[in-house]
Structures are given as C-alpha cells and as structure tokens.
C-alpha cells in the first residue's frame, strides 16, 4: 500500500506536521509506504485554465506539480494536511488541488483510494466545521477518494503545541493512519 502525504502547512514541525507524522506512523506500522511532500518546498505553478490538459496527457506546467499528480494517480490513498488561514486552506494546498483538474480531464488517469484530512486552526475546535465538511467532499470525494476521516485540532497556535496540549489528537491521527 502506497500513500502520498501532502503537507500544505508552510511550517515544518508545526501542528499539521506533528499530526501528519502520527498518521504516517500508523500507516507504516501497518506495512504501508508513505511519500511525503512539503508543498511549500515544491515548485508548483497555479492552474492557468488554458485547457491544455483536455487535449494532452498532463498539465502544460513543467513543474513538480505533475510529478506529485502522477504519484497520486499511482497511490492507494492520500493524506492532506492544512492549517486554516482566514477560513480556508493554505495557498500551498490550493495550488495542488487546483491542478487536480488535469487528472479529471484525462480518461486514462483517476484518483481513488482512501483519503484522510488534517486541519489545524488557532480558533476553538468546530469554528470551521462547515469549511472542513465542504473540503472533505470537494475536491476529495468529487475526484474519487473515499474520505475515511479527519482530525481537526482547534486552538493550535505555536508550532508543535498540539503534542503538549492535545495528546488525544495525536492518538486520533495515529488511529486514522491504521485505517489505511
């Protein structure tokens, strides 16, 4: 089993990263293999709506986005982790998700398998429940993933504080990793 982990937080070692590492631990303990991408470090250009992908096997952008999309197509599932900034996912996360369009345009490619989502925000848990539910269904379910669950850690401020103040969230992430 191969899982692609997309870390959309620009903060390595931050709360999303800590939770993702716990989820990865659960997957690896079950014999799974995980390829983790820090989207902040990848060269991913935005979709320019040129429709090149409707006529060709991949996006016109010659960047790391195509490599990641190919990994997603070949994988058995995905973990997507993002902090909530001003009520939405980070720009780093949105860049790769917008590029899902090129897969949807190609009849030889599809996204499938299991998906697990991680959200952190510096607001009380539940503040962004509507947004989280919307994100679970669009684009992940829309593109063909079975969303098996999510971890939402509210009141997650300084980097790594979730490990100290919300150890149950680490357990949730680990347990969700075992479900892959």
How would you describe each model-predicted region?
Residues 6-8, 39, 118-122, 153:
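Cofactor-binding loop segments of dinucleotide-utilizing enzymes, especially the Rossmann-like FAD-
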Residues 1, 24, 29, 139-180:
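Glycine-rich phosphate/pyrophosphate-binding loop and the adjoining helix
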